[in-house]
Amino acid sequence: MELGKTKCVHIVGIGGAGMSAIAELLLKSGFTVTGSDLSSGEVTDKLSELGAEVYKGHSEGNVGACDVVVYSSAVRPESNVEILAAEKKGIPVIKRDEMLGELMRFRSGVCVAGTHGKTTTTAMIATMLIEAGESPTVMIGGISDYLKGSTVVGNGKYMVIEADEYDRAFLKLTPSIAVINSLEAEHADTYATLDELRDAFIDFANSVPFYGKVICCVDWPEVRRIVSGFNRRYSTYGIDETADLMARDIRIEKNETFFSVDYMRSHLADFRIAVPGRHNVHNALAAIAVGLEMGLPVERLVSGLAAFSGMRRRFQIRYTSPDGPIIVDDYAHHPSEVKAAVKAAKAGWPEREVIAVFQPHLYSRTADFAGEFGWALSGADRVCIAGIYPAREDPRNFPGISGELVAEAARVAGASNVSFFEDGKELSAHLAGYCVPGMLMLFMGAGDITGISVSMADFCTKRS
């Protein structure tokens, strides 16, 4: 793989899920990689082991003699000292999505987009292709134990990428197969209206070449709405009977889901996946549709998906015991994702009391979706709301917005036993009382709530 005369790449925010995947791919492809991040941890340690020079914190001196600087949407280029230093030196500065687009030129690209389910669907496709002997190159915005990380450098013709719609990043990619797994209002800081979001997904679909294909889930009303704007071949999947590829007879047992699939009204095969929930059936259908488009044998699709073992922070079971609780950690941070996770927990473990522990992510999202979060959480037996994780936002810009808005919305939606804890230590102390048999604690959020799930799992392990 060559990028002109580029030998050294510096990555600002190298510890982020998407950025670390690019760094890993570049390292495994023979490039020199340097990078910086405000914090260090497991991800940056792994990159260092692979040969990257990683700096903690941002400094002009970190840029060095690199050939290009890459940054993510989370970085503000107008104020970041490394980006300003690179521009002063005349070093090209590009966003993550532009680098991804360049890396895709060397492969036949499969890009998975959608407001929900991207990470899991991408990992399912990757697992299926690896099991089929296709040796794909893979980049995912999450950690897969099967893949031993978020990136795989293969020698086959396919490159499978999670395509992010935030900041219209996915429009820089060059897919041969474009998957649209879901679509609803999201990222109000990028898309002022739902029409803008729809138009972006239509542009993404039409970015495939004339010989390519769009694969989309028609169970989502907004997806059904945009297909009329496609000018490329497309096929549909879903639980809806109008779909070309349809799942039926869905059965959820603990951490497994079983279902049958029909293709063009004829039975295709029966499938099993080692993750719970109807939302994961959608993800699996997308992978099956991709495999069919590639011409893979049906038996390879069945065995490939059976090998999928889930993703970290996607309904990840951190602790389980018949003599104690089940503790689950999930990345859900949108109302639809929260609702899907709660339903999966209730369907898989009907005998257990489900305690939904939710940390809102972003003040703006909390303000926009507080009511919807309340309805999504109301299916749990108990609800605990943590303080908002601000991420890129300044709390001072959002007076009056707190997690209590979500707690009150859950009460209005009919949830019982709703509590709000601004302080994480108080939340942990409260939850410790529920580390008993018959309970399932479902931690949800894209922030540091995952740390409390880990501490609860450690508490239960030490006590057992």
UniProtKB/Swiss-Prot annotation:
Single GO BP term: regulation of cell shape
Main location: cytoplasm
EC code: 6.3.2.8
Catalytic activity: UDP-N-acetyl-alpha-D-muramate + L-alanine + ATP = UDP-N-acetyl-alpha-D-muramoyl-L-alanine + ADP + phosphate + H(+)
Protein name as it appears in the record: UDP-N-acetylmuramate--L-alanine ligase
UniProt-recorded Gene Ontology molecular function terms: ATP binding; UDP-N-acetylmuramate-L-alanine ligase activity
Entry-linked NCBIfam families: murC (TIGR01082)
Organism placement in taxonomy: Bacteria, Pseudomonadati, Chlorobiota, Chlorobiia, Chlorobiales
Keyword presence, Translocase: no
Location of this chain's protein in the cell: Cytoplasm
Keywords assigned by UniProt, alphabetized: ATP-binding, Cell cycle, Cell division, Cell shape, Cell wall biogenesis/degradation, Cytoplasm, Ligase, Nucleotide-binding, Peptidoglycan synthesis
Family: Belongs to the MurCDEF family.
InterPro entries, alphabetized: Mur-like_cat_sf, Mur_ligase_C, Mur_ligase_C_dom_sf, Mur_ligase_cen, Mur_ligase_N, MurCDEF_pg_biosynth, UDP-N-AcMur_Ala_ligase_MurC
Cited function: Cell wall formation.
Binding site for ATP: 114-120
Gene Ontology cellular component annotations, sorted alphabetically: cytoplasm
